[in-house]
Amino acid sequence: SALMMVIVTSVSLMVHIYTIGYMSEDPGYQRFFAYISLFTFSMLMLVLGENLLVTFLGWEGVGTCSYFLISFWHTRDSAATAGKKAFVTNRVGDWGMLTAMFMAFAAVGTLSYEGINHAAETGGLAAVTATGIAMMLFVGACGKSAQLPLYIWLPDAMEGPTPVSALIHAATMVTSGVFLLTRMAPVLHAAYPWSGDVIATVGALTALFA
């Protein structure tokens, strides 16, 4: 979390500075700064949350802001379409994360990372339950981190102003899925071994074909 906080704030600072000049002549200057500031706040909430609920609030925040930013020039049909594609695709991933949260709470009685991971490490989480949670979290990660088959929104994200592409692509939003799986590593370890193979295979196929 500390490392991600440094990365998010550093990248965001550079993007904000670049935006001052890049968007200076745009009539939506103030609106754009409001969006990227809210995006940064949401990303920090995502990486600093102590439990899955706070992380999910940040998760939804960056998803909503990505829609606002990608479709910023909404008078262009291509930008409006790209924004809607990003919004809908990420909702599929959100369904996966919500399902994982419900499963974790039903099994452990808490949404705290510490509580869930402790249960996974001490055998308090059955392998079948851990596998279900891991796979649903991976569905969420596929949406945010643009993995197959939910990668289709990312190329169209270029329809937004250049600072948007920098903020979304440069070690912030697209890394949030990887960050989530890393924080839940004990659950992945408690899951059936094939779950790791699924994650690795999808990642490799995304790298080759997406």
Where in this protein do the model-derived segments appear?
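...captures the hydrophobic TM-helix bundle architecture rather than a specific catalytic motif
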Residues: 1-210
